[in-house]
Amino acid sequence: MHPFSRLFRNIQSLGEEEVQELLGPPEDALPLLAGEDLNHRVADALNLHLPTADLQWVHKTNAITGLYSNQAAQFNPHWIQPEFPELHLHNELIKKLQQYFGPLTINEKRKLQLNFPARFFPKATKYFPLIKGIKNNYPNFALEHFFATANYLWTLWEAGILYLRKNQTTLTFKGKPYSWEHRQLVQHNGQQHKSHLQSRQNSSVVACSGHLLHNHLPSEPVSVSTRNLSNNIFGKSQNSTRTGLCSHKQIQTDRLEHLARISCRSKTTIGQQGSSPKISSNFRNQTWAYNSSWNSGHTTWFSSASNSNKSRSREKAYSSNSTSKRYSPPLNYEKSDFSSPGVRGRIKRLDNNGTPTQCLWRSFYDTKPCGSYCIHHIVSSIDDWGPCTVTGDVTIKSPRTPRRITGGVFLVDKNPNNSSESRLVVDFSQFSRGHTRVHWPKFAVPNLQTLANLLSTDLQWLSLDVSAAFYHIPISPAAVPHLLVGSPGLERFNTCLSYSTHNRNDSQLQTMHNLCTRHVYSSLLLLFKTYGRKLHLLAHPFIMGFRKLPMGVGLSPFLLAQFTSALASMVRRNFPHCVVFAYMDDLVLGARTSEHLTAIYTHICSVFLDLGIHLNVNKTKWWGNHLHFMGYVITSSGVLPQDKHVKKLSRYLRSVPVNQPLDYKICERLTDILNYVAPFTLCGYAALMPLYHAIASRTAFVFSSLYKSWLLSLYEELWPVVRQRGVVCSVFADATPTGWGIATTCQLLSGTFAFPLPIATAELIAACLARCWTGARLLGTDNSVVLSGKLTSFPWLLACVANWILRGTSFCYVPSALNPADLPSRGLLPVLRPLPRLRFRPPTSRISLWAASPPVSPRRPVRVAWSSPVQNCEPWIPP
């Protein structure tokens, strides 16, 4: 049935004779459909012209939103965070693959070397402050989203997917180190690496004296008077520390020895002796610097000891009064219980600059509750909140990593059909725009015709899903400074609190109570039920870098496609009688019998598990002869969209209002849905050309009742996209602005147009006539526009009818000099000659879905327990 038969009869401006002529023979109707006057008259009847600007646009139609009506993201307080297995590829992946699959090809090695490890070194990187680490996409659930996102990041760190930044040059992580990480190894399983330990022993005494003195100190306590220490090292007078008989080097060495003995001595002794508030703050800074660094496994004596020269140069600039105003812990801190550090008291820790900072969470211990909703009630309910930070199994050296981030993070639903689980979104969009833009490598994506050519066969199908596929591919540690994420800590919710203020006294604690509101208090109580003591760890700021491939970088899809395609190629070579197809994290297996498919699946699962590749068993599906893949149903008869997409499209299209101007954003979102099913309709994409014109013009579009009903009738009747076959071309078509010609193996045909036409339009009409009169599914032509198959550049009515006529037709290029239809198109009928032998090969869009393999040797041992379905030594190759 003609696609315009019902539409033309409903247009009153078209007479009955004109309708019969338009629906008549194609040689008469097609030139008329290309006429500009007819297209304008039909557009007027369907009200397809752009509306005037004085009409008010509609910005929302049921489920489709347009301009100024963006839907707010929905936060789920009961999101389930996924659990990640130990994702660690084998250290010798290429050698291990060669043991299983034999020698690898050059392309397979190249693809694997790109991913092991992956490298990402942009020319420019923009760094953002840590306060932008977690995006506030849910203002009504800011605190809940903050802790949920921080917990997600710590979950990734525990799975070995993220590095934790300890300082500018040190990273720590959990899991097994890769071979390239062994070169930068500092600490592994609590033990110093040999190379790092040797370099530390060869360094200066200042850099490592604290660690060495601690190892060589006697076990019995040594009584050292605090008074003597303060008089001998620092002194109550500034001049006494500067004008001694001993040299500066001796003073520095004595200072280090005394401080090391104090840190190794019983803390109860120091607590009993106490300390005066008038003691120089420099002594307390160095003591706390050593204790904090010793707990974290590092020494920071060098930074504190090297400042003696700076303090000596500032002796004349600062008086004794100004010196006493330097940073010193408050009185409550000095009177805290030293016998149980890390449990109560305003515990100090070092930031990355070596400056002691206080734990915001534990600081509520020493403050009086400001009201009934004070956080003091929550903090004081537990004595031991655990450590402020953690250290992984492995510590490595890294390039200079600033205390900044390169992208924010937030949580969303895992997918539109699963709102119970959360997914982490990393915003590394700076590498896709601006001066920091990176031009990502391109890779081929299978189109609809490619899927039909390669997968539309009568096989048994099985689809596999790689669990957390992006997180399988490791990244070089040198790329960490470009892929930084983090959390600003609770200070994000109290902007008045500043850790860099010079007036550090108890008045600062009053600003902390700005957090004490009813909403924060009730939210923390609910979060405590979820996270327990981990709430304290999540409240601290931290910076992490990606150790595995993140999903927010444009390089990730390219690398993942290379990785999975290399695996599919190796499996295909070893199982030449099956079909293996990989796209991103989806792997498809096809075999002639279900028993053979089961054997291949068992072997692949065991091999992948040994290589460290985890498959999601819950998403493994056996499809039989109907493969569901990428939203399509692929069978031996062709490809059709899944029912859920058809129902969604019909629901959205029926909800579109009639005779109301819809803004172009609604048209964009509607065409996104219609384009998915358009290749299966009679008129294809050409039916949506009026919508494309409105979107390109950035103006509104009005659906008439005739146009809407016509679209509904088109999308109710779907036709499969069938597989193309490799045959020899036997029909050729050519045209001139005034005539057309067709050449077959047995005859030559020619004709003329009633009026001159553009050459591309004439070539398209000639191809349509050749298809109608010969029924050939393969045509030879010399016009590149017709070869492309993109008909949206032609007049609207002609494009729709041509798409209907040429549906399922393939084209092959023939030069004009060799085209046998060239002379008939010019009105000449020469003697019939043999046609050029042109063989058509179905295109695969540069997708290597299968690898050519040698024939199966008859002496090769069988891979399955029963007889192989291969009846001969020839490998089965997709058509």
Swiss-Prot record:
Biological processes annotated in GO: DNA replication; symbiont-mediated suppression of host innate immune response
Polymerase/reverse transcriptase domain (RT), as annotated region: 383-724
EC number(s) stated in the UniProt entry for this protein: 2.7.7.7, 2.7.7.49, 3.1.26.4
UniProt key word Hydrolase: yes
Region (Disordered): 304-345
Molecular function via GO: DNA binding; DNA-directed DNA polymerase activity; metal ion binding; RNA-directed DNA polymerase activity; RNA-DNA hybrid ribonuclease activity
Region ranges (Terminal protein domain (TP)): 1-184
Binding site residues for Mg(2+): D465, D585, D586
Reaction(s) catalysed (UniProt annotation): DNA(n) + a 2'-deoxyribonucleoside 5'-triphosphate = DNA(n+1) + diphosphate; Endonucleolytic cleavage to 5'-phosphomonoester
Keyword DNA-binding (UniProt): yes
Domain of life where this protein originates: Viruses
InterPro entries: DNA/RNA_pol_sf, DNApol_viral_C, DNApol_viral_N, HBV_DPOL, Hepadnavirus_pol/RT, Rev_trsase/Diguanyl_cyclase, RT_dom
Matches recorded under Pfam families: DNA_pol_viral_C (PF00336), DNA_pol_viral_N (PF00242), RVT_1 (PF00078)
Domain named Reverse transcriptase: residues: 393-634
Name by which UniProt lists this protein: Protein P
Organism this protein belongs to: Woodchuck hepatitis B virus (isolate 1)
